[in-house]
Structure formats: structure tokens, C-alpha cells
């Protein structure tokens, strides 16, 4: 995994940096951490329904998965967020 700062955000890549290798963006905010994930809504396992229904088209516009968002506001949410990040990592090439 490779990380790269981008303004106030951190981009996470599987291997080398590049659009197709990017699998998540961490956005640090006053009220918590917002994470944009590369996701396949047909195979994503999200029993707690954290993933927003809205699809974004800012960071992941290469046709490999959709851009979805989760928010972390409590320490206790980190373990579940990591499970969602692992699924997103698997979609990056």
C-alpha cells in the first residue's frame, strides 16, 4: 500500500500511485474522518449499512467500481471501517 497527501486529504493506493490503483481517500474533518471508497455495490458486504446510497464521481472515474462514502465519528467505528477498506483494496488493480 502506498499513501500520498493531496491537499487536506490522503490518497491510498494498492502498490504504485495511479488512478487505477487508488482505492480510498481519507478526508480529515473537524467532526471525524470521511472516507471515499472504490466499491462494487453488487458485491460489497456492508451489513451495518454505512455506505451512502449516493454515488460520487470525483476520485474514482475510471470505470472500475463506484465511489461511495462512509464517515467515522467514533473510535469504535474504526474496525468496521477497516473491513470496508479491505473490500475496496481488492477492487484496485
Residue ranges and their predicted role:
Residues 5-68:
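Short, conserved beta-strand/beta-arch hydrophobic-aromatic motifs that form part
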Residues 57-93:
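Well-ordered alpha/beta subsegment
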